[in-house]
């Protein structure tokens, strides 16, 4: 009678090796995740991929339950990092332009487009004109150019948007408020690039009175609507 062959000793413990590898990878991942120093996103993604995958083709798999979403969670970290950079830029802009914000010459906000630096036209331009009041605006525009050139905004693109109110009458030869708003955006661009901002990172738009932020029924609302927005674009609006 033939004797039964005994299974190799190592085969019965194959699941233990797989489980041990998974635990080790998880430990490395969470140590790096909660390390207070800067985290390399690429490394985290590689670790997550190793955890979620099943390198042995058998045994215990981490591809089910909460661990199944681990790779997706890590993939969201670059977006989170970019959001944090934009929040940091917003805080820096508020501090940098504090005097102009206090005097209502500049407003710093954020919306679905990205970070927005709004120049009040009455403080930067002559009434009905695309000519800049250089004496009043030069120092502020220099700081705007320096801010846009900061390494923290590397890779970002900018859009300069001109806006008017519903009653402003062009006095600089512009045929209408569409042309006036566009000319003002162009004029701001020229000053920013003269002060060192990179021209190839900009785009321009003139919206006349079609993008009002406040009601045009009051003088105060119209004054705030007369503006030039410098938008640090979120990636989805490139």
From Swiss-Prot:
Stated family: Belongs to the MotB family.
Gene3D superfamilies, per the entry: OmpA-like domain
One GO CC term on file: plasma membrane
Subcellular location: Cell inner membrane
Predominant location: membrane
Keywords, alphabetical: Cell inner membrane, Cell membrane, Chemotaxis, Flagellar rotation, Membrane, Transmembrane, Transmembrane helix
Membrane topology: Single-pass type II membrane protein
TM stretches of this protein: 15-34
GO biological process terms, semicolon-separated: archaeal or bacterial-type flagellum-dependent cell motility; chemotaxis
Domain OmpA-like: 112-236
Periplasmic side: 35-238
Function (record text): MotA and MotB comprise the stator element of the flagellar motor complex. Required for the rotation of the flagellar motor. Might be a linker that fastens the torque-generating machinery to the cell wall.
Protein name, UniProt field: Motility protein B
Topological domains annotated Cytoplasmic: 1-14
Quaternary structure, from the entry: Each stator complex is composed of 4 MotA and 2 MotB subunits. 2 A subunits and 1 B subunit are thought to form a single ion channel, so that each stator complex contains two channels.
